[in-house]
């Protein structure tokens, strides 16, 4: 893979989903929604317990965005990030976790 001369933009996001939903399903939706500038999706935490429903889990991801031709603007990253949230909440019946 080509290495970009431009900086990565890294964002973390967590979703609460039914325990039966597999992380791989969510990752596929994230990658499809993230567009060509989303370079990677990595799970960094899976949580069950307090503040999460009995049949639910929280899965947290680190998303890395980059463009090989320019530095990404805040707006470009925010637009992609918002599309990811919309798609995951709709297609995976997920809730954005705010804490």
Regions found by a protein language model. Name each.
Residues 1-99:
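A carboxyl-terminal module marker
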């Amino acid at each position: 893979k080509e290495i970009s001369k431009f900086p990565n933009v890294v964002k973390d996001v967590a979703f609460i989903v039914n325990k039966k939903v597999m992380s791989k399903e969510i990752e596929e939706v994230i990658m499809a929604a993230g567009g060509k500038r989303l370079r990677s999706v990595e799970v960094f935490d899976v949580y069950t317990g307090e503040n999460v429903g009995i049949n639910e889990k929280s899965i947290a991801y680190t998303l890395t965005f980059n463009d090989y031709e320019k530095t990404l603007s805040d707006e470009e990253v925010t637009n992609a990030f918002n599309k990811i949230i919309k798609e995951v909440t709709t297609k995976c019946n997920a809730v954005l976790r705010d804490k």
